[in-house]
Amino acid sequence: LERIRFDPAVDRLWFCGDLVNRGGQSLETLRLIHSLAIHSTIVLGNHDLSLLAISTRREADQRKVNPDLQRVLFADDTEILISWLRRQKLVHVDRTLGFAMVHAGLAPKWTLTLAEARAREVEEKLQGDGFFKLVKNMFGDKPAWGTKLTGFDRQRAITHMAEQKKKKK
């Protein structure tokens, strides 16, 4: 932040997911970004979603993940950080600035408005009572997106579509 001369009075930082499990300082990264509060905008990446899922597992299973993630999972402020991550978005659109941010790309057929609406479906589960069931069923490549999908199949497909990289033809 010193190098870029970050000034919280005028600057806002945008973080494009994968806040954890990159570079070996996940706990420090989360704490720093959390401390920036209103001076930052975040979208979740697949690594962040994985951390949320791991955070719901039994302690014995959490101890099997890499040491970097273990430091997050067993930190004194884990509950605060996990709760804060759960409140972040999958898609952020700033219409005033004319910019949008997602972690890795959007489904080619989705408009930003549609992407926001679909992302909100998953975000509501992340933030609400459906969190534990969502993260248990969130991962996997199937089914492919279809407008007739419902329940966890739909949420899994939305998460995948909001996190996928556009494939070259």
Predicted regions and their residues:
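N-terminal active-site segment of His-dependent metallophosphoesterases
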Residues: 1-36
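Conserved, helical-rich catalytic subdomain that frames metal- and/or nucleotide-binding sites
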Residues: 141-169
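Active-site neighborhood of divalent metal-dependent phosphoester bond hydrolases
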Residues: 27-30, 34-151
